[in-house]
Structure formats: C-alpha cells, structure tokens
Amino acid sequence: MDALEITQKLISYPTITPKECGIFEYIKSLFPTFKTLECGENGVKNLFLYRIFNPPKEHTEEKHAKESVKPLHFCFAGHIDVVPPGNHWQSDPFKPIIKEGFLYGRGAQDMKGGVGAFLSASLNFNPKTPFMLSVLLTSDEEGPGIFGTRLMLEKLKEKDLLPHMAIVAEPTCEKILGDSIKIGRRGSINGKLILKGTQGHVAYPQKCQNPIDALASVLPLISGVHLDDGDEYFDPSKLVITNLHAGLGANNVTPASVEIIFNARHSLKTTKESLKEYLEKVLKNAPHTLELESSSSPFITASHSKLASVLKENILKTCHTTPLLNTKGGTSDARFFSAHGIEVVEFGVINDRIHAIDERVSLKELELLEKVFLGVLENLSEK
C-alpha cells in the first residue's frame, strides 16, 4: 500500500481530538509482524508498534532490555487526532476526495498525510542488518497532550523500549516539500500580572491610586520586549501580551487593578527564573502580583547529528532542495522525546492549509515524503 491509499483511509476516520474511532485497529492490521503496546487515560488512546529486524540468534526481548549494546532503534511518531473541521467545506471533511492533484480532507496536512507516508515507508522497509523500527501514535496532540505521547514514552521507559532516534511527521514545510526541518522548538511560558491600585471617583484623583498610571510606565518594558538576542537557530525570546483588562466599564470610576495576560516564546537563553527576575526588576515600584507557568521547555537537536544529516541527505536526493534547519512555530510532541534524551527532528508536508477549511495535501508531496522516509530508514540501517 502506498502513502496515498493509507492517508485516504486515515482521513475517513473522524478522529476529532481525543477520539480514536477505531483507527488503531486499521493501522495494526497493516503490521501483523510488529508487536504492539497500547495505553491511555481519560479517553485518550496511544499505540506503539515495534519490530526488531534480523536479531542475533541469541537475542531475546528479555536480553534486549538488559544488554548495553542494542540494535539502533528508530521511531516514527505522530498523532491521528484532528481539530474540528468547522463548516463551509466544499466536501465532507471525513470523506477524502482527490481533485486537481490534491487530496482533500481534515488532517490531510496535520498530520495524517505524514503518518500515511511513514506507515507506507515502514511497510516497504526490509533491512539486512539488526535494526529496530517502531511507530508511536496518539489521539491527544491537538488537545491538552497530557495523556498522549508523554504518557506513552513513560511506559516505554519502564519497559526499556525508548528509541535512540525519532522523526515526528509534523507539517514543517512552508512553500515546497523539503524546505524546512525542525531541529528544535522554543519553550512557552504563560504569565498573569496584576497591577494593584485603589478604586475611586475620577473627580477625586487624590483619593485614588490608578494602576493604569503604573501600566503606562512599565508597558514599553513588557509588551513585545526581546528577552534575549536568540542565536543561529532560535529567534529572540519575546514577551507578547494576549489580554489586558481593567475597570468596571463606567466612565467615572478608576480601576482597582489591571490584569495582564501574556506569553513568552523563548530560546534556551531564557528561563522562567530569568523572566521572573526581569519582570520583578521592571515592576519594583509598582504594587503587583505575578504568576508564571512553563507549559513547555525549549530543546534542540544538533544540526550535525546523525539523524539530521541523514534526513538532509535524503531530502536533497529526493526533493532536490536543501532544507532550512530551524525552530520556528509552536510546540509539538517532539519536546517529549527530547526530554528523554532522544535525538529527534520534525519533518513533513507543507503547512499552508493546517486547521483550515478545505485542508489538502499534494499527491506529489505524499509520494516524495514516503521516499524520503524510506531513504532515511535504509541509510540508518546501513550505518
């Protein structure tokens, strides 16, 4: 089965996060020679398929768990859940159609196209040396992500089945297939700042302490500020205000407080602690409360790593383009792999229609992506 056929089947399952809708039974049926592990909580389901090719005669699974020298273990990872499709589609979002060289359907780009490509590549892979191949899929990536990939990796750690390397098939490309590989991601810190004052009548300002006056002085030091200068792969860390509220809606009452909600997408150079230190310094003369919560940590895989190098080689060979290595965009499940010390990168189709009405993927992209993934497997098994 090729990537197109598998992707069409995957799209036909209405797996709006965190629903799995039986899609894992279909995927398992494609891999009768692979062993399976499944886990999940709170309506989330996760699937791990794995096979050790060409194990030494004395090899057993028990020995695999104990021996210090193991076959290289490579994992393809992704999610089968999708965001709600919304209205105004030209066709049923869960009945895939092909039109003018594109496959239409919810998840075509994010990320059932990528999953279809790596499932097809895995089916066509036949190494001649000892090699361990696995597939990790979750129904909880578009949602909170608490019981998805993170949970499955913890289970794999308990069983000593963590991979050495992984590719997460997120739609990373911008204009043409092969133009972008994510070798890391920025971290994300959420914050709430409350500037405190004294509510009162606008006609008696001497009896009020208007927190908006304090806001006016500190706002230029908070809104849009660069927290560091970034580096070759990370943009400068930046604080962005997402919501600001003050007052009762009356024109003759000064507010008792101003609430500011913000987010900081940050590189390895900025931490929650350094952000707190900066903000407390800026706010030292303003009565306030400050809450910070890190929702994800930044990470990076070395640009010269074996995995990144092999992937670049196959993109150049198949797509005839040299990819840009970067960390742009939001968070992804790749961060959970990195937290376990796993060499991880992200690569997939173009992302111009993700989460959009009439989401689609080019048929040519699916064909080329499958070839890239198969080439990566073949090269890794040879080295």
UniProtKB/Swiss-Prot annotation:
The record's note on quaternary structure and interaction partners says:
Homodimer.
Gene behind the chain? dapE
- Secretion signal: which residues? none
Catalyzed reaction equations: N-succinyl-(2S,6S)-2,6-diaminopimelate + H2O = (2S,6S)-2,6-diaminopimelate + succinate
- Tell me the GO molecular function terms: acetylornithine deacetylase activity; metal ion binding; succinyl-diaminopimelate desuccinylase activity
Listed under GO biological process in this entry are: diaminopimelate biosynthetic process; L-arginine biosynthetic process; lysine biosynthetic process via diaminopimelate
Pathway of action: Amino-acid biosynthesis; L-lysine biosynthesis via DAP pathway; LL-2,6-diaminopimelate from (S)-tetrahydrodipicolinate (succinylase route): step 3/3
Tree of life domain:
Bacteria
Its job: Catalyzes the hydrolysis of N-succinyl-L,L-diaminopimelic acid (SDAP), forming succinate and LL-2,6-diaminopimelate (DAP), an intermediate involved in the bacterial biosynthesis of lysine and meso-diaminopimelic acid, an essential component of bacterial cell walls.
User: Which protein are we looking at?
Assistant: Succinyl-diaminopimelate desuccinylase
Residues holding Zn(2+) 1: 79, 110, 170
Gene3D superfamilies noted in UniProt = Zn peptidases
**Any binding details for the cofactor?**
Binds 2 Zn(2+) or Co(2+) ions per subunit.
Q: Which cofactor does it need?
A: Zn(2+); Co(2+)
What parts of the sequence cross the membrane? none
Keyword list (alphabetical) reads: Amino-acid biosynthesis, Cobalt, Diaminopimelate biosynthesis, Hydrolase, Lysine biosynthesis, Metal-binding, Zinc
